[in-house]
Amino acid sequence: YLQYVVESRPTFFTVWLGNADLLQFVTSGGTRPLTEVGTFSANVKLLFDALAEQGARGVVTNLPNPTLVPLLMRPSELAAYRKDTFTPYWITTGAGEIRPATDEDRILMSADSIGFLTRSGFPKGFFKIAPLGNDDVLDADELDRVQQATAAYNATLTGEAGARSWPVLDANALFQKTKTGYLDFYGNRVETDFIRDGQLLSDSIYSVDGLHPNARGHALLANEFIAVINKVYQAQIPILNLSQFEGPRLAR
């Protein structure tokens, strides 16, 4: 990819690196490794050096907190969504401990077979003898690890961009704001969660996989890029109206 960047001779760029390095850990319940900070930093520097050598200008984006994606649910949220009254859920932590889940942990929305009988004869997730697997859960320690990695990656991105006088789009702050919800310039409601009280919310910026932005989410991100480009590079690109872009929907 680095060679491709050099050969393409870019004059303008947008860079958003590192999401996959974090999300491979998140989506696997912490069973897949995080990219070492040193490796991430070295790769960022190589790419940024290649872009700078071309004399290109652009926008660098930092990384949002990956633990805010709808894929991850607090046990209390999952119980309300599933209408489970027999709780707590039992989980297997990254350290191999089997214990009741707390709201300091997150259970993946994709966790399968919850409540189905296991070989032990007990329903999965509701008894110590039949806990959710480590790959179904991000326990409190794993959440801390991925948040520390996010902070380290962002320090690299911000530092390397600043050394070259490139602006940084603060996607981390943006996604923190969408978690609580807000109204945009056009009065459109913007939020992260796409299910509330068992109902699908049309205002969410996420697809129903709980991980990737939908059309509405990509339009929101485009507006953030446009705002930075217009401000820093004195462009006059019009922003998008999110109401023209579809939110989450189930396949028919």
Label each region the model flagged:
Residues 1-35, 60-77, 115-137, 204-205:
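Oxyanion-hole/transition-state-stabilizing segment in secreted/luminal serine hydrolases
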Residues 3, 38, 42-45, 49, ...:
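Solvent-exposed, polar/charged alpha-helical surfaces in well-ordered, non-transmembrane soluble domains
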Residues 8, 31-42, 144-151, 212-219:
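Soluble non-cytosolic domains of exported or imported proteins
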Residues 53-57:
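A short helix->loop->beta-strand "cap" motif at the edges of active sites that frequently abuts
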Residues 73-148, 155-211:
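Mobile gating loops/cap/lid regions near enzyme active sites that modulate substrate access
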Residues 193-251:
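Histidine-centered active-site loop/cap adjacent to the catalytic His
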